[in-house]
């Protein structure tokens, strides 16, 4: 998977 997964930062 080339597209990185979005990780929300709180």
Curated annotation (Swiss-Prot):
Q: Where in the cell is it found?
A: Secreted
Q: Supply one GO BP term.
A: neuropeptide signaling pathway
The residue ranges crossing the membrane are none
Q: Which UniProt keywords apply?
A: Amidation, Neuropeptide, Pyrrolidone carboxylic acid, Secreted
Identify this protein by name: Locustapyrokinin-2
Residues that the record marks as modified (Leucine amide) are: 10
PROSITE patterns tied to this protein: PYROKININ
Major subcellular site: secreted
Decide whether keyword DNA damage is in the record: no
> Which residues are annotated as modified residue Pyrrolidone carboxylic acid in the UniProt record?
1
UniProt family annotation = Belongs to the pyrokinin family.
Q: What does this protein do?
A: Mediates visceral muscle contractile activity (myotropic activity).
Q: Name a GO CC annotation attached to this entry.
A: extracellular region
Organism of derivation: Locusta migratoria (Migratory locust)
- Intrachain disulfide bonds: none
